[in-house]
């Protein structure tokens, strides 16, 4: 994880989608929030959020006639990276321990895996998680719940 004086913002997959797809129901909220951030704010992708964004942008059931090609997905991602407003973070030390703490229950909860990963990544990396998911926001100290 690079060190800097920048605020490190870690959007979940749905926030990334809303920032990059104008027809997303939460796009106006996401863009208003984004526009109010200081110029020095840095956005963080992890491999999970990168692939999740690509998957949603290229899924017809999500974007209907606006479904994007792989090349278009890469172009959106490259704009973030090339602009210097975002970077890809490697998995921070302590991630797996944090994930195990959150996802070691006796019940089968398939939807918990990704949330546990994102929460643990944010905490281990000292990142500010941003999400539309109220329950996920409650799991991470300092998380931002949009909407």
Regions of interest found by a model, annotated:
Residues 141-147:
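Active-site regions of enzymes building and remodeling cell-envelope glycoconjugates
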Residues 18, 54-55, 78, 82:
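Generic alpha-helical structural context detector
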Residues 20, 57, 140-141:
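Short, flexible helix/strand-to-coil boundary loops that buttress conserved ligand/catalytic motifs
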Residues 1-10, 14-45, 60-72:
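Short, well-structured N-terminal submotif of metal-dependent ribonuclease cores
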Residues 15, 49, 94, 135-136:
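Alpha-helix capping/helix-boundary segments
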Residues 83-134:
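Active-site neighborhoods of divalent-metal-dependent phosphate/nucleic-acid chemistry enzymes
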Residues 42, 98-100, 144:
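A generic "structured core" feature
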Residues 45-52, 72, 114:
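Short, conserved alpha-helical segments within structured domains
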């Amino acid at each position: 994880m690079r060190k800097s004086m920048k605020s490190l913002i870690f959007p979940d997959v749905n926030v990334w989608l809303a920032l990059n797809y104008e027809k997303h129901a939460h796009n106006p909220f996401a863009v208003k929030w984004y526009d109010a951030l200081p110029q020095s704010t840095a956005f963080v992708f992890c491999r999970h959020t990168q692939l999740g964004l690509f998957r949603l942008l290229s899924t017809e059931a999500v974007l209907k006639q606006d479904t994007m090609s792989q090349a278009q997905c890469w172009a959106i991602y490259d704009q973030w990276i090339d602009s210097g407003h975002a970077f890809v973070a490697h998995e921070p030390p302590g991630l797996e321990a944090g994930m195990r703490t959150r996802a070691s229950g006796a019940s089968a909860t398939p939807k918990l895996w990704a949330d546990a990963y994102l929460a643990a990544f944010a905490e281990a990396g000292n990142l500010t998680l941003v999400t539309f998911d109220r329950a996920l926001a409650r799991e991470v100290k300092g998380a931002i719940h949009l909407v």
